[in-house]
Structure formats: C-alpha cells, structure tokens
C-alpha cells in the first residue's frame, strides 16, 4: 500500500482516518481536485499524451473530483515541472508559468465556496495559487487564493460588489510552506482565511449579491500564466463549490497537510 502523498499508480488517495476527498463531491458539488502525488493523473503535453515523470514539465492534470475540470497549459515553456522530495510530489512554478482549466467551471448554482491548498512561496511577491476567472478583480462571482507582496497569504471573494473582499494572514515570510484554506459565502457574507488549520482572519463585509460565476480556473498564475506567477510549489489543490462543515474542513486540511509535509 502506498502511503499518503505517494500515490504513484493512480490509486485514489485515502487518509489514515479513512477520509477521501471524493466525498466532498458526493452530492454533485461543482469543483476540482488536483493531486500531483498521483502521477497517472498528469501528462507532459496539453493534449493528454506522454506520461508525466519527475523533473519534466506538466501540461495536463486531471480533475479527480469527477467534474472533468482538467487543467492544461498548451505553451511548452509555461508548464510547471513535476518534482519529488522524499515521499512528497509537487508542481514547481517558476517565472511565467501557469495552468488553466480547458473549460469553464460552472459555479452559477452556488454562492458558497471552499478552497484548500498545500502551497509554498519562495518569494514575497504577489502571486496566485488559484483564481476563478482570468481577473477576479474585474469579474463578478469570483475568488482568489494568493500570496500578497510582503509576508501575507490572502483569500478574497466577491459577488456583484464593486471589488473583492480580502482577508489576509500575516507573518508568513518566504520561503514558507503552508496549508491554506479559503471559505466564503456571498449571501450570508463571510470571507475566512485559515493557515495550517487555524483561522487567521475573517470579514463579514457585503460581497454584493448573486452566485459565483461560470469561469475558467487559473492555477499558479493569473490568466493562463499571464501575470501574478507563483514562484513556488503546489502540492494539493481542492476547490469545492459548497459550504463545508467543521468536520469536512478538519479532514480536508489534515489530508492536504499530509500531501504537503506540514504538521498541523
């Protein structure tokens, strides 16, 4: 049996507690689950050919949530690289690199969002981990999980408000690796950022009205690698278009922590 985070042969990861991220999508929730520890879920080319291998670019990563939200990069020099460190696997982003879903993800049926990531930033520049739409600041019904220049992680969300409602977690000076959680609801307005299993900040400022939108999801950069490029790593990324219970949050954070090599 492969341990958590060493899922080389495509077996669905299940934590030692029995938690499986697929359970987050059991009721038809929209979203995505990207798992760099599952080498069978990745390919070198954006058309889904050429098996992924360590130290080579990744141009295609399957969505394991069952929503078919495959993320790709058609331009060869904009692809992240699959890396291994001991039992851990991750996508390394350097410079103008990023992935984007081949199709949009239709979150128009929900105004709640749960975002979980295992990420590392190597610099204290502004950089995206995940962003719904090509520019969340200019698109209603979007969110953004990112690093902000300085020592901050940020989760931001909006409905039809004039701008994003931001929550920041401070004192995370690069290089640093963390489990990041963003939770938000538009109609019952809250935006929460958690780091390593602990809530760090929240806001109940109005995000306007409406639901999340039908947009592409960007990973590791804005607009298909066009800006806010991450200099760092992504070990795990789970996007769920629904609110999550305390048990679901705790289980998912523990799962992501094991994938990332972080102790909660």
Briefly describe each language-model feature range:
Residues 18-25, 92-113, 163-172, 223-225:
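Short surface loop/edge beta-strand patches of beta-sandwich-type extracellular domains
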Residues 38, 119-121, 183-186, 223, ...:
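Short beta-strand segments enriched in hydrophobic/aromatic residues
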Residues 62-97, 116-126, 134, 139-207:
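Extracellular glycan-interaction surfaces
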Residues 2-70, 116, 233, 244, ...:
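GGW-centered surface loops in extracellular recognition modules
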Residues 158, 212-239, 244:
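Extracellular glycan-interaction patches encoded by glycine-rich segments
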Residues 24-29, 83-85, 108-110, 147-148, ...:
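Extracellular/periplasmic catalytic domains that process cell-envelope and extracellular macromolecules
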Residues 29-31, 57, 61, 88, ...:
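Extracellular structured ligand-interaction cores
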